[in-house]
């Protein structure tokens, strides 16, 4: 059985986004809407719905492959899904970011460069890597060689066992200070963008204030970041089980109507842009008192 839909790229109404264009969005106070995608059709829908940045996340290990964590995902699998998404974005506008999976960059800059090259040759325009100060040398090495880098602090799922599970990071004073220190170190190393995951809103706000040139993208980090990201399966209500409090199901409108996938993604983009999502109470976390 096959689809008979026309596979060729269609014209979009937006100009392709670049790193300078994303920076300009931040400078004029426009929020950046990021969303995950793992295959071409949904990537195209997300692009047409106005998503600014598509993330081919190693979260595919959980929501696509059915694993309990992101750890089993391989570089070859990330490259495959990146190629799929890149084909869906042909003729589109969204900026494409791809995750370096576990153990593909941990041995140092040279290994990271080889892995980054694989993903960029597959169509990525920026690579994302998890980790604190120990990744600064690698970030600098990649940026000096023309690879745009998105860092990732807070809850880093590839370190789930070391962290003792999916727990909020930086809730106490010492933890918050360490996250701020690491964020500044990675920014100085050249990271242009940074995902801040599962941390108190005040900590994420401080990271952004410390590094005004950094494009912070929050997920469970409150409303003060330069943008937001969600896993597409979560915001479409496809994920089963208990979801984190920062997730909102956009398949249902505020008026109680059921939306199409494209309209749900449009609603997500609009909510990010007008700062109605995330809610500073319902979708956020506070520091320990």
UniProtKB/Swiss-Prot annotation:
Report the catalytic activity: 3-methyl-2-oxobutanoate + (6R)-5,10-methylene-5,6,7,8-tetrahydrofolate + H2O = 2-dehydropantoate + (6S)-5,6,7,8-tetrahydrofolate
Which protein is depicted?
3-methyl-2-oxobutanoate hydroxymethyltransferase
Q: Where does this protein reside within or beyond the cell? A: Cytoplasm
- Which co-factors does it depend on? Mg(2+)
Annotated organism of origin: Leptothrix cholodnii (strain ATCC 51168 / LMG 8142 / SP-6)
Task: Give me any GO biological process, just one.
Answer: pantothenate biosynthetic process
Where do the annotations place 3-methyl-2-oxobutanoate binding?
Answer: 58-59, 99, 128
Q: Where is the active site?
A: 197 (proton acceptor)
Q: What is its EC number?
A: 2.1.2.11
Pfam families found in the cross-reference section: Pantoate_transf
**The keyword ATP-binding is assigned to this record:** no
Supply the source organism's classification. Answer: Bacteria, Pseudomonadati, Pseudomonadota, Betaproteobacteria, Burkholderiales
Gene assigned in the entry: panB
Tell me the function of this protein: Catalyzes the reversible reaction in which hydroxymethyl group from 5,10-methylenetetrahydrofolate is transferred onto alpha-ketoisovalerate to form ketopantoate.
The domain of life is: Bacteria
Cellular component, GO, one term: cytoplasm
Q: Which family does it belong to?
A: Belongs to the PanB family.
| GO MF terms, alphabetically ordered | 3-methyl-2-oxobutanoate hydroxymethyltransferase activity; magnesium ion binding
Metabolic or biological pathway, per its Swiss-Prot or TrEMBL entry: Cofactor biosynthesis; (R)-pantothenate biosynthesis; (R)-pantoate from 3-methyl-2-oxobutanoate: step 1/2
Q: How does it assemble?
A: Homodecamer; pentamer of dimers.
Class of enzymatic activity (EC top level): transferase
Please give the CDD domains that the UniProt record associates with this protein: KPHMT-like
Q: How is the cofactor bound?
A: Binds 1 Mg(2+) ion per subunit.
Instruction: Could you list this entry's UniProt keywords, alphabetically sorted.
Output: Cytoplasm, Magnesium, Metal-binding, Pantothenate biosynthesis, Transferase
Q: Where does Mg(2+) bind?
A: 58, 99, 130
